[in-house]
Amino acid sequence: MKKLFTLMLLVLMVSIITFAQDQPQRPGPQPPPETGETFKVGMAGYTFAKFDLETALKTLQKTDVHYLCIKDFHLPMTSTDAEIAAFHAKLKEYDVTGYAVGPIYMKSEAEIDKAFEYAKRVGVKLIVGVPNYELLHYVDKKVKEYGFNYAIHLHGPDIAIYPDAEDVWEHVKDLDPRIGMCLDIGHDTRNGKDPVADLKKYQSRVFDIHIKDVTATTKLGYSLEVGRGVIDFPAFVRMLREVGYTGVCSLEHEKDMTDPFMGIAESIGYFRGVIAATK
């Protein structure tokens, strides 16, 4: 009787497994349009200046974004090694990689030292920074010492330094080739420049890109959802391919920062739609 029961149980288990295998599997989503491109789609941590890390990561998960430029309000520069390890473990839960730190403003050699050591402990090879002009030769020294890339974040007409890609280029062209720029296409546009032309012209020094749209090519222009402003995104995506950009295009959404989520989704969706439509 016991053998019969065991045999019946085995037959039942085989039947269940066979039935499960015979059921059609529901198809999953297609991979994001940037799959197969040389560049990646990411998120600038500053987008979540009003929110904690968990909220940021849940948003990246919902939008299928896997690269984060780390801001120090999510991982303070004073973090211990244990806190840094816990931070990376949290990112891993959401299949997110922290690929850079910054932007970090640097007004002294001591602040530059602190930023480079922070990046080393975090385990990234790219710093997005804003050093005073007179400190660039010290940045050059630290780049040689650490072997990192250093991307200067341009800021349009709003602050006195690094208004556009041309200005960054003129200040770094004779320095170590690992010193370049984070091409913020919105700020570049607001200073009257063409980010498509600037990407082509300065491609050898473009190490990171911040994606946003703006309403005008002047200081009066302001940030809004990607696709609603004046930037020619189809031309920009084509130029990414033409120059073979291999870095990350990170959305830096600066509108409705206390409730940015609809704008983030719209912007990522539009940018990916352009990637798909221009293949």
Specify the residue positions occupied by each region the protein language model found.
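Conserved residues at the C-terminal ends of beta-strands
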Residues: 71, 104, 130, 212, ...
